[in-house]
């Protein structure tokens, strides 16, 4: 069976929409709207391909935290089969979390990103997951797989 394989980190974007400006340090400004969205290149490719009816696998890092739960639910709703790259028993938040403030003239970001080591064992797991795919998208760091 043909499928698309995508490999990379998942982002969860916290979008503060309709900010009049970026707040100064120590200041609080309220946004007109707020959204939580799935982000990241690999997840975006996987979700859009799945929406087109293409069988899709995504190798990414997921944990037992709130943000990973949100990402899992989004993958499930969009027909993406995630393969978890997080180590068994790993703690913390393995997905990137970005706060984006959108103002009339531009946007500003603050991102949390947990560093992850790309080991030979991890590369082997990615190879096993993506073997047989007709198209593979790899985030930087995973290119040695091919």
Give the location of each predicted region.
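Glycine-rich phosphate/adenosyl-contacting loop at the front of the ribokinase-like
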Residues: 1-61, 68-70, 77, 133, ...
């Amino acid at each position: 069976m043909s499928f698309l394989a995508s490999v990379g980190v998942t982002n969860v974007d916290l979008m503060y929409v309709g900010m009049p400006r970026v707040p100064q340090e120590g200041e609080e400004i309220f946004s007109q709207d707020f959204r939580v969205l799935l982000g990241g290149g690999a997840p975006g490719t996987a979700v859009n391909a799945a929406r087109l009816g293409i069988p899709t696998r995504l190798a990414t890092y997921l944990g037992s935290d709130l943000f990973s739960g949100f990402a899992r639910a989004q993958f499930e709703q969009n027909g993406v089969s995630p393969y978890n790259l997080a180590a068994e028993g790993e703690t913390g938040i393995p997905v990137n979390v970005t706060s984006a403030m959108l103002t009339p003239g531009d946007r500003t970001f603050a991102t949390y990103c947990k560093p992850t080591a790309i080991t030979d064992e991890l590369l082997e797991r990615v190879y096993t997951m993506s073997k047989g795919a007709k198209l593979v998208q790899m985030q930087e760091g995973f290119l040695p797989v091919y």
